Amino acid sequence: RLYLNDKIIVDSKQYEKLTPAEIITYSSQIGASKIALELGYDDLKSNYYDFGFTKPISINFPSSAFGYMAIKDNIVDKELASLGYGYGLTISPFQIASAYSVFANNGIFKDFKLLKDENVSSRRVISESTASNILKALEMATKDGTGKAANVNGFSQGGKTGTVHQIRSGSGYAEDMYLSLIHI
């Protein structure tokens, strides 16, 4: 358990100590929270920006609206920790697909296109080594972790599961849970 202000963050299982790869493999909200707290708000916000989460995607397609992240001057630890595992963010399916393509593209972010276009702009957002390490962690998640039900034998793959509560109008989160999987 991780106690922050009046919030308690828990994982589905108790872990002694996890590596960054294991945090991804086992979907550790405590681990993701600690990383976010260590990075700090400005670096976390910058990383979300680099991965395309806070800007529009340059396609004209339904559901391609850009994501949202509350910009705050005085963020408290529990809010920062929640951003570490994706709460407080709203992103489109195209944005999550673009972000995960960074790991398969050796750390390069490429603008999302629906049709093949050889002139797609791209930029490095993480090192090849970091992309490789995250890709290996995503592969572990589909072999041994929370995404193993999505494993398809005979294919090289990686994925990450997610469980979220949608933001309610006003304040707080809806009680309904939504499950997701991103697979590369």
Q: Could you say what each language-model-derived stretch is?
A:
Residues 184:
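Calmodulin-binding IQ motif helices
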Residues 1-181:
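Beta-lactam-recognizing serine transpeptidase/beta-lactamase-like catalytic domain environment
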